Swiss-Prot record:
Catalytic activity from the UniProt record: Cleavage of a beta-linked Asp residue from the N-terminus of a polypeptide; L-asparagine + H2O = L-aspartate + NH4(+)
GO biological process, one term: proteolysis
Class in the EC hierarchy, top level: hydrolase
Protein name (record): Putative isoaspartyl peptidase/L-asparaginase
Record-annotated site: Cleavage: 206-207
InterPro entries the record matches: Ntn_hydrolases_N, Peptidase_T2
Amino acid sequence: MNKKSVLVIHGGAGVISKSTISKEREEIFLNSLKNILLAGKIILKQGGTSLDVVQEAVRLLEEDPIYNAGKGSVFTELGTNEMDAAIMDGTNLKAGAVGGVSIIRNPIIAARAVMEHTNHCLLVGKGAEEFAKSKNLEIVEPSFFFTQNRYDQLLRAKDEKKLILDHDGENLLEKEKEKEKNNETSTTTTTISVGVDPIDPKYKMGTVGAVCLDSFGNLAAATSTGGMTNKMHGRVGDTPIIGAGVYANKNVAVSSTGTGEAFMRTVAAFDIAAMMEYGSLSLKDASNKVVMEKLITVGDGGVICVDKYGNVEMPFNTEGMYRGYVIIDNNCENDQNDIINVSIYK
């Protein structure tokens, strides 16, 4: 048995600071993260595998509408929800992903089904949805994913002919509404112009993810997202791209959040693993080099990582990232040596 088991989760990165998020909303996120970590801890304590744990952690994140994934997914320019998800097993490099799905309740479950029941890594759109139906996964009406807050973001983006990238748009919009309530004039920019390059590095991100080391020493990673508010119909980001939004092997597991196109261009998740394997860098050095030196030149965001020794790194180059981890001492029968931590800001 491995000396320790570890679960790390994130709920997205972006313009998340104490000046853009209310204390009440801060507590909602922290409690949600903690509860999901506790649920994952139970599975690990019962001898669950890393693959089962990351799937369940991400499924729970998808079920909570405060995150931009599953139930809380943002809307496209057409007023629809198009979700992406991916999962990877570090023990054998098997992976599965879905992209642009609109009626699958939990895209992460569909991603695992792709991994386990097809010879492919990625299915998209209607094909992915038909496959999910064939595997008796839960299918819902598109209206299931409607949330007023996300729809308000879309209306605002359309009204200003802009693109809002969660969590920035959500938190800054919340702050602006608060100012309007107090009859103040807000000068905070909540959106970015759609132009040749709509991915402004100052504004990002909405994704959820999990990485895990189980008691058997196995690693796994999973990521899920609704994308960005007012995105083009058919746009797919880094989340379902193996090596960009998610990666796991026998040394490390990584889940990304941030400027999707930047993570694809830098193959960020795989780059961390490659630096560790071929450059003999530590998890800390590799993850920080990618996020703080390489990624930042083309976009913003962060990653959560755990290596085969149970070391945890969660670097991000934005103002904040919803994140947390639980570390379980497998040599101790009770919980006295277990560690759980949740945080938002730097």
